[in-house]
Amino acid sequence: IKDLLEAERLYKTLPSAQQWQPNKRTSLPMVHLLLSRAYLYMEEWEKAATYANHVITNGNFHLLDLNTIKTYSEEDPSIPSYINYHSYTTSSEVIWVYGNITDVTKYVYNASASTNDHPFFRASKELMNCFDETENDLRKERYVIRSKFQIINEDNELEAMPSAFGKINVSSKAYYQPVATNDAFGRSLRLSEAYLNFCEAKAMLYKAGVANAGQEALNTLNEFRRFRFPL
């Protein structure tokens, strides 16, 4: 915490235009998000909510509306389409990018460009069912990447296997395998975490007796949901 607070102090000495830039470097909103996460772990709910709100109200970031993300190729509607959610250019939520795609996926996917090679793992039935608990959850088709490797599911139906990874850069020409490039990263700190941190912190404050905190949590959660479910 001490180091993060010192980093916050130093970043605030910079002009606002230099406190964050989409250049893969650390920044003030990155520090704010990490402080929110740390205070949440420490159960210091008010501080967690305060720092999460700093990120939420930062004008550099906006929730990405999944209603606007196509799930198929415009050239051929039969071909699924996925975007990289850990990219400054494709997601307005990204605060900081990090991590090699190969490091993220090498233990769950065989990178050989052949339909005969099997992925090591698939997204669990329990996870997939979670998306079905709420009607028309947009995250299922946009976050969970379907490989061209087909499986027989629990209903004895043939389906494209849901991969044990998502949100990353993949190739439609190589069986939707992960593609590592100099500008493609496997992980990122994103605005969406700030929303979840804020909601959890406010919910815990409500549980502790802060009367208006519950409504704040609900309002923020409903605002977040507008970008993850059909309009």
Predicted regions and their residues:
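Short, cationic low-complexity segments
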Residues: 117-140
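Acidic/polar-rich alpha-helix caps and helix-coil junctions
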Residues: 1-108, 132-231
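Active-site-adjacent substrate-recognition loops and nearby beta-strands
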Residues: 108-120
